[in-house]
Amino acid sequence: MSKVIVIGGGAAGMIAAIAAAQKGHKVILLEKNEKLGKKLFITGKGRCNVTNAADMDVLFQNICTNEKFLYSAFYGFDNTRVCDLLEQAGCPLKTERGDRVFPVSDHSSLRCFQIILRT
């Protein structure tokens, strides 16, 4: 078993730590703040808006002017895979108006990420 250190407990850092742990690595997640996912904590009016369920082409049309710049990043780990990762790890999700995706619990405490990261 190899060891992985992830620096930064934001959304990307938490997802990287979860993905590494699911592949059998021993993971240490380092974060300078007292809470993980500090910015994610305030999304969706405090309910933890984890992603958007819209088709990738629709997302590109609405969020960027240079689609080619973000294409590989978005298709390397798209919104469907984010949802699958969280649900497989025990965080049920729901999709609301505007294709916004939230934990079913509607809690902004990021418990779904914290539970996954502790296992």
Residue ranges and their predicted role:
Residues 9-14, 38, 45-47, 91:
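Gly/Ser/Thr-rich helix-start
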Residues 76-119:
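Feature captures the FAD/FMN-dependent oxidoreductase FAD-binding
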